Regions:
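Hydrophobic positions on the alpha1 helix immediately C-terminal to the Walker A/P-loop
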Residues: 49
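Short glycine-rich substrate-engagement loop in P-loop NTPases that contacts/grips substrate
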Residues: 70-101
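Pre-Walker A adenine-sensing motif
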Residues: 13-33
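Interdomain motor-coupling "hinge/lid" segment immediately C-terminal to the ATP-binding subdomain
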Residues: 2-5, 10-15, 139, 144-252
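Structural recognition of the conserved hydrophobic beta-strand(s) that form the central parallel beta-sheet
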Residues: 107, 131-137, 158
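Hydrophobic anchor at the beta1->P-loop junction of P-loop NTPases
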Residues: 38
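Accessory nucleic acid-recognition modules appended to NTPase machines
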Residues: 66, 207-364, 371
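Conserved lysine of the Walker
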Residues: 46
Length: 426
């Protein structure tokens, strides 16, 4: 990294006007005394949240030269070697000698690309009054380096694509209580959400541009977060694995069947490689593998996982939207609704399957989802699952179309839009 070139990068960032921003539900503390770390899938809004932090700091009277904002994916910073991060401080001091001694605010994007970043950030926190905000797109990399270099010094936040309430806010929609017409607008908005997904830029883009944007997103994750970061040697297998996972939200995942399918098509791959690639996809926040709800860690590890994706719209990169079942999209959305809040989630396998169990060490709620309850077989199947003996007192059936069904005692039916909007809770 060259210091003179770095000055141009810093100055360019200072001169660019802040873009218009839609606020997210998460409000970051500006003066926590901790390093704030935002982790999540690419294009989920982490960078815009950093820019919103900058906007708030400027509104509080902080001078623009006190804010150092850099993306470590900027090719002008390459090659970046360990020990060169101090050049950032030197370059900023030379650009703004009048601000030396004032608090500095550091906003670093995709920080995992900077060798030795955790030691540098620790020193910033120890020696520079102000605050440090970081983003990254690898859960394992950040958690490992935070654990070794910044234990007890960080507040970490997972950033997901838009929730349904955030989607409504982005579109300028608001529910009016006790209004049947407003209820209908909310239900239609949910249909749109389950089609469009929650990637912020995609939601705001023209419909004709969305497929191309989604394909670019998946390509970016494929190359940068998977192939290049982990130096994977079998891109064909990785591409097929991504295609398979993104097209199968809310499905039981059978690695052995996929292994046989890939082998039958002439793609040589070992099972260990397949599991390793899956782990990398989880680290990149592309997928989530939901375990069976068992107290035994061994049973959880041995049983099949249920696959969920960070945003079902990414599956449209490989096939048209209608090919992905809308009921599975709804189930995936309900999973994400809870995953944003906690990690101890599971499912119950078997003929009377429970889609989502909240609380693995002691079930707090059973939640099933269905698109429509008008079909008698669907209605009876969901009831049998939720009314099985044992389990928690909270049992909820979330449906897009309730068809006027009345739940028996001990079970609640909640319209999907109300549930995902937070108007009714489990």
């Amino acid at each position: 990294m060259d210091k003179e070139r770095l000055k141009y990068v810093l100055k360019e960032g200072e001169e660019l006007p802040l873009p218009s921003m839609h606020p997210r539900a998460l409000k970051l503390p500006l003066n926590s005394g901790k390093v704030l770390v935002l982790v999540g899938i690419r294009r989920s809004g982490k960078t815009f949240m950093l820019l919103d932090v900058m906007r708030q700091l400027l509104a509080q009277g902080v001078e623009r030269g006190q804010i150092i904002q850099l993306s470590f994916e900027d090719d002008r910073l390459q090659p970046l070697r360990a020990g060169q991060l101090d050049l950032i401080l030197h370059a900023q001091a030379e650009l703004h000698p009048d601000l030396v001694g004032k608090p500095r605010y550091f906003l670093f994007d995709e920080v995992q690309n900077a060798p030795g970043w955790e030691r540098f950030v620790r020193r910033l926190q120890d020696t520079r009054a102000g605050a440090v905000f970081l983003t990254g797109s690898s859960s394992r990399l950040l958690s490992r380096e935070i654990a070794t270099g910044l234990r007890g010094r960080c507040l970490s936040y997972e950033i997901f694509p838009l929730s349904f309430p955030e989607y409504l806010a982005f579109r300028g929609l608001r529910h009016e209580p006790y209004s049947t017409s407003s209820d209908a607008v909310m239900a239609a908005a949910l249909d749109d959400y389950l089609q469009t997904g929650g990637m912020p830029e995609v939601v705001l883009a023209e419909e004709a541009l969305r497929p191309r944007m989604l394909r670019e997103y998946t390509d970016l994750v494929f190359y940068r977060d998977l192939l290049e970061r982990h130096r994977l040697s079998n891109p064909e297998v990785l591409r097929e694995l991504m295609r398979y996972c993104l097209a199968a939200p809310a499905c039981l995942f059978n690695p052995h069947r996929l292994y046989l399918d890939l082998r039958s098509r002439g793609l040589a791959v070992g099972k260990d490689t397949l599991y390793r690639y899956l782990g990398h996809m989880e680290e990149a926040y592309l997928i989530f593998l939901l375990p069976v709800a068992e107290r035994s860690a061994r049973k959880r590890a041995m049983a099949p996982k249920k696959l969920h994706v960070v945003d079902w719209s990414l599956g449209y990169s490989y096939q048209p939207g209608p090919m992905i079942d809308r009921g599975r999209r709804l189930e995936n959305a309900v999973f994400l609704h809870h995953r944003r809040q906690r990690e101890d989630l599971g499912y119950v396998a078997g003929p009377a399957e429970i889609d989502l169990v909240v609380g693995l060490d002691g079930a707090e709620a059973w939640i099933n989802t269905a698109w429509s309850l008008s079909d008698e077989d669907t209605w009876q199947r969901e009831l049998r699952a939720l009314q099985r003996p044992g389990g928690p007192t909270t049992r909820v059936l979330v449906a897009r179309e309730t068809a006027g069904r009345v739940a028996p005692q001990g079970t609640r039916i909640i319209e999907a839009w109300r549930y995902l909007a937070g108007e009714e809770r489990a």
